[in-house]
């Protein structure tokens, strides 16, 4: 990888010279050599009482100078654990690891006859996802408070909805939860009932859907999809409850994806940029169209996640990449 930091050559406590950075690269592991080559290099090196090199490349270059060592392009996410502080950085890196679905095609043959349940399917992302799945010949069942009185914050209502679908279709392949509540206001202006309702829908609703979905998706080796927000990485003023529940959803998805992978259940989380939905318009008013993602594009990414092999991933959806 290109050297981005300032590299200095010192003489004691003073800079002797600064090498030309354009000629420097950062080496990464792994380093690979023919067994015969590396064995011969170390055979010579171990006879040298002044042996000081710290990596295999250095051993080969110093002790077998006629052997060319080819360099390939590295990857920024290939981080080396050297110092104690690196463990913290690597932990954060894996927490924020994301995936994108740009190259996954949507074929009717993959979705025809599949049974999908969408919670929060009455408008916005849920409505567009339902419509697109139906266009691909999937059987779609939508539930929401406004459509048929189903509140994901109430476990028994989620259970009844899934049971009704299963009794009718005898299988459930996909379960998608787009239900969410956003109230844009300072925390100290919020009453406890409003806070409770938001947590009940956004977070407890996620848990309820997951727990009630488990048996059906275990049988079908199905897919479970939830939604987060770009605010999950850093809390935002005036919607602390919303952003904190979205952070909780990411952590929850990553955890149950590991638990349920042995049973063939894939669990992912869609992370769209600011999206034009009725909920956003209600809270933020009219915004420039070119600054918002369309609900249709988020729906496409949602369906792509259903036909992907991903699990435990936070899937970014961006305006310029969909």
What spans do the regions from the language model cover?
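Conserved NAD(P)H cofactor-binding loop of Rossmann-fold oxidoreductase domains
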Residues: 178-184
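N-terminal Rossmann NAD(P)H-binding glycine-rich loop of SDR-like oxidoreductase domains
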Residues: 122, 130
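C-terminal helical subdomain
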Residues: 269, 285-322
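Alpha-helical segment proximal to the catalytic Tyr-Lys
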Residues: 215, 258-259
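Active-site helix of classical SDR
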Residues: 210, 245
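Conserved core of the sugar-phosphate nucleotidyltransferase
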Residues: 1-72
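Substrate-binding pocket helix/loop in short-chain dehydrogenase/reductase
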Residues: 186-187, 191-196
């Amino acid at each position: 990888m290109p050297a981005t930091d300032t590299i200095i050559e010192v003489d004691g406590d003073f800079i002797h010279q600064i090498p030309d950075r354009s000629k420097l690269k950062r080496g990464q592991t792994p380093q690979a050599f023919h067994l015969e080559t590396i064995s011969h290099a170390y055979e010579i090196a171990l006879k040298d009482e002044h042996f000081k090199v710290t990596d295999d490349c250095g051993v080969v270059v110093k002790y077998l100078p006629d052997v060319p060592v080819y360099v390939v392009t590295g990857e920024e996410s290939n981080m080396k654990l050297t110092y104690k502080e690196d463990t913290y950085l690597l932990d954060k890196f894996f927490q924020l690891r994301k995936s994108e679905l740009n190259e996954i095609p949507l074929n009717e043959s993959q979705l025809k006859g599949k049974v999908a349940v969408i919670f929060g399917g009455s408008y916005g992302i849920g409505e567009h996802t339902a419509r697109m799945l139906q266009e691909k010949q999937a059987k779609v069942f939508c539930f929401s408070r406004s459509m048929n009185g189903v509140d994901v914050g109430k476990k028994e209502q989620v259970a009844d909805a899934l049971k009704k679908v299963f009794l009718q279709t005898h299988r459930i392949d996909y379960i998608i939860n787009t239900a969410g509540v956003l109230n844009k206001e300072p925390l100290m202006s919020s009453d406890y009932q409003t806070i409770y309702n938001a947590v009940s829908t956004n977070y407890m609703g996620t848990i309820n859907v997951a727990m009630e979905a488990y048996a059906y998706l275990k049988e079908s080796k199905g897919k479970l999809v939830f939604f987060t927000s770009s605010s999950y990485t850093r809390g935002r003023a005036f919607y602390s409850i919303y952003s904190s529940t979205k952070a909780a959803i990411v952590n929850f998805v990553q955890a149950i994806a590991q638990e349920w992978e042995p049973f063939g259940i894939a669990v992912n989380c869609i992370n769209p940029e600011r999206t034009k939905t009725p909920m956003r318009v209600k809270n933020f008013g009219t915004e420039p169209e070119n600054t918002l993602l369309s609900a249709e594009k988020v729906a496409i990414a949602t369906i792509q996640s259903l036909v992907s092999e991903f699990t435990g991933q936070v899937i970014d959806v961006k305006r310029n990449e969909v």
